[in-house]
Amino acid sequence: EKDRALILVIKKFFGGIGYVSKPNASSTVEFRVSTLKDIVGVILPHFDNYSLITKKRSDYELFKQVVLLMLNKEHSTLEGIQKIVNIRASINLGLPNNLIEAFPNIVPTERLENYMDSNTVLNSGWVAGFSTGESNFFITVQKSKTKSGLATSLRFSIAQHSRDILLMKKFIDFFGCGYIANYTNRSICEYIVTKFDHIIKYIIPFFEKHPIEGSKYINYSDFKSASIIIKNKEHLNKEGLEQILQLKNKISSFYANKTINN
């Protein structure tokens, strides 16, 4: 709900089609386009021209197959419905149990796996937009043997399903820093930057030039403020450390609320 303004900008970008839902029980709003005319005339041309480069590309290509079947009115026949169910079985998390029971002869459609190759180059606008939705900015304060008894550090990260590890590696090339953590037990891979010099030299200058949109910009702003305090070594005194702790608590509160709402 707090990013409704950003959702409305997206709606305007697509020519005003669709609608923005009212907040649900978890305070989430959605931009939805459900008419075949708008999907065929606006949504498909956009994503054909500006291809997705995560695993969602596979879902999009399958979604497009369903749209074309409906455009040809094949969904009006039992055979066409079976084709759609076969495709649906390969999208997102697959089919709910009631559909599996209703269609016992399901043959899941093959997914596109090579949606990205080693020659793909990320562009700044895409990275800024992707970071708006998927990045995280953290301030860490830990006990240490320093005079204050506490040590501060910063962490920028982007996490995705492990199937998108090739994309995560692209961020290393794009930013010129960072590393990949692959959590095989959770099927998650993560691009991480923790070296303070790299955050100051690469991460913050990028987002100053290509700003993050929506409520996450506040997180970035607090993250940046903390970096300035650390750069000036003001975190070594009581007042500066208190400022760092306040900024850390603001960011932690944001992610805690996000987890609750989701």
Report each predicted region and the residues it spans:
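Sequence-level preference for short, compositionally simple segments enriched
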Residues: 1-262
